């Protein structure tokens, strides 16, 4: 959304599908009796450690990037901007639940207390947008994530610049 000429201070986009959290990287240790040559130091070591991001995380991060490009026209916040990220994570209503429970879920009376944890939902979205929507997710100074049920599972994301106020906090 643009307000006041070409000044964009907020973007919104929706990632369709079930919310996905950031998976923990798996550490793989490889052994070679002949050794591995370290590219930086030139030293030869018998073991090499490699961190591998789970495939599901890589696929979801790529989906987030594609959706952002498509819905936000490649907008990027200034490198010095302080950002506020709001996430609404809508989980699918389980088919196995009773009609009464499903109605309560749809009305927001019952909310998800299941995985993925909201911090991992935030992390996968924030990391996906590094160097695309902003320089780095360290620019996010305020964040809120809320979990709901819906017949239409999705993740809604709003990112906006934080207004600088003169009063001190803390």
Where are these regions (language model features)?
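Acidic, proline/glycine-enriched N-terminal capping motif
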Residues: 2-170
């Amino acid at each position: 959304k643009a307000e006041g000429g070409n000044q964009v201070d907020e973007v919104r986009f929706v990632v369709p599908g079930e919310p996905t959290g950031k998976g923990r990287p798996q550490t793989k240790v490889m052994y070679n009796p002949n050794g591995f040559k370290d590219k930086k130091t030139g030293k030869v070591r018998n073991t090499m450690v490699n961190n591998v991001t789970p495939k599901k995380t890589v696929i979801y991060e790529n989906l987030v990037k594609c959706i952002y490009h498509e819905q936000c026209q490649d907008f990027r916040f200034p490198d010095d901007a302080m950002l506020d990220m709001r996430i609404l994570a809508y989980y699918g209503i389980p088919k196995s639940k009773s009609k009464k429970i499903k109605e309560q879920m749809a009305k927001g009376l019952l909310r998800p207390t299941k995985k993925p944890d909201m911090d991992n939902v935030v992390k996968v979205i924030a990391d996906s947008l590094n160097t695309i929507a902003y320089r780095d997710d360290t620019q996010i100074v305020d964040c809120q994530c809320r979990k709901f049920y819906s017949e239409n599972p999705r993740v809604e994301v709003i990112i906006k610049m934080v207004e600088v106020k003169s009063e001190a906090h803390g």
